[in-house]
From Swiss-Prot:
Keywords: Metal-binding, Nucleus, Zinc, Zinc-finger
Subcellular location, record wording: Nucleus
Zinc-finger ranges (B box-type): 17-59
Region described as Disordered: spans on this chain: 63-95
Family statement: Belongs to the CONSTANS family.
Residues annotated as transmembrane: none
Source organism (scientific name): Arabidopsis thaliana (Mouse-ear cress)
GO biological process: regulation of DNA-templated transcription
Taxonomic classification: Eukaryota, Viridiplantae, Streptophyta, Embryophyta, Tracheophyta
Protein name (Swiss-Prot/TrEMBL): Zinc finger protein CONSTANS-LIKE 6
Length: 406
């Protein structure tokens, strides 16, 4: 039925649509080898991008009758030149769309790009904190601002207004040179410069501290003079022996005293300057304390109670051996020297009180000395071994692992 209808329409000069066979064909698609009307051509070639690229030919309308009769009856005018081709064109012509570019770019885009570049460069720049440069820039900005119109800041007379015609209305918003100078002076004083270096000691509150230090030095000098005078007087008298309390205290408990002194110094620093001066005075008084023994008064009070010597024989006292060393030592040599002097004088301190106390003290000191010495040797050996041991990234490494790594 469709073929007969198409052949019936094809018998005329016009060609029917191959798709709907109802309307006259207006387009010929070589890729599809089909004659299509307007509606069918639009629906077929809008289906996908591949169909849109098909090349189509616009068919002309039927010519006059004379031209129709001049042509051969078996061949139509529209069929001349058309041959059957492949459904997909091989290397067909492509429609090149002309894209026009502005040869001269707009000025606004260039300015915007340059401004962005300048901003990116300024981000990585170090600001120049120079007072001279800032002042110069400030003066230049003031000169540029003078070009703006005038606005009076307050109600003035006509003469004053004439004098101020050269100033800008924006000058009131910026500080003057006097204000800038005052600001720089304040900044210098805050930073430690300027006139701050010439403040007197009394203004800073250090006068009282200096006075206290001077008084302490004078008191120390007086105490040392008194001690020297007393030592000289003791040397001249044959029967007076002065035992320095500080010396005995330091020889027996030297290490304990050092710890106590450190604690005392820490407490003194926290208490303040006034309490520190009072503590120093008390320490000087303790140093001035001395133990004296007058043999004449002892013998007179002893009377006829018997011989005062425990050995029943008076010991020979060598006055040259009575003097004690002025320096204090925490070593065992000074302690032994101190006890040897007492034994030479016949004064046995351990026998007067507890008989075994002296032996216990000596054993304790010997044990402490050997323990400290052994600990020191042990730590030194560990330190040397640690320095010789191989390390890798700050940690000890076994020698076997080093050989494997190499």
């Amino acid at each position: 039925m469709m073929k007969s209808l198409a052949s019936a329409v094809g018998g005329k000069t016009a060609r029917a649509c191959d798709s709907c066979v109802k309307r006259r064909a207006r387009w010929y698609c070589a890729a599809d080898d089909a004659f299509l009307c307007h509606a069918c051509d639009g629906s077929v070639h809008s289906a996908n991008p591949l169909a849109r690229r098909h090349e189509r030919v616009r068919l002309k309308s039927a010519s006059a009758g004379k031209y129709r009769h001049a042509s051969p009856p078996h061949q139509a005018t529209w069929h001349q030149g058309f041959t059957r081709k492949a459904r997909t064109p091989r290397g067909g012509k492509k429609s090149h769309t002309m894209v026009f570019h502005d040869l001269v770019p707009e000025m606004s885009t260039e300015d915007q790009a340059e401004s962005y570049e300048v901003e990116e460069q300024l981000i990585f720049e170090v600001p120049v904190m120079n007072s001279m440069v800032e002042e110069q820039c400030f003066n230049q900005s003031l000169e540029k601002q003078n070009e703006f119109p005038m606005m009076p800041l307050s109600f003035k007379s006509s003469d004053e207004e004439d004098d101020d015609n050269a100033e800008s209305c924006l000058n009131g918003l910026f500080p003057t040179d006097m204000e800038l100078a005052q600001f720089t002076a304040d900044v210098e004083t805050l930073l430690g410069g300027g006139d701050r270096e010439f403040h007197s000691i009394e203004e800073l509150g250090l006068g009282e501290m200096l006075k206290i230090e001077k008084e302490e030095v004078e008191e120390e000098g007086v105490v040392t003079r008194e001690v020297h005078d007393q030592d000289e007087g003791d040397e001249t008298s044959p029967f007076e022996i002065s035992f320095d309390y500080e010396y005995t205290h330091k020889t027996t408990f030297d290490e304990g005293e050092e710890d106590e002194k450190e604690d005392v110094m820490k407490n003194v620093m926290e208490m303040g300057v006034n309490e520190m001066s009072g503590g120093i005075k008390e320490e000087k008084k303790e140093k001035a304390l001395m133990l004296r023994l007058d043999y004449e008064s002892v013998i007179s009070t002893w009377g006829g109670q018997g011989i005062p010597w425990t050995a029943r024989v008076p010991s020979e006292i060598d006055l040259d051996m009575v003097c004690f060393p002025t320096h204090t030592m925490g070593e065992s040599g000074a302690e032994a020297h101190h006890h040897n002097h007492f034994r030479g004088l016949g004064l046995h301190l351990g026998d007067a009180g507890d008989g075994g106390r002296e032996a216990r003290v000596s054993r304790y000191r010997e044990k402490r000395r050997t323990r400290l010495f052994s600990k020191k040797i042990r730590y030194e050996v560990r330190k040397l071994n640690a320095e010789k041991r191989p390390r890798m990234k700050g940690r000890f490494v076994k020698r076997s692992s080093i050989g494997v790594a190499h």
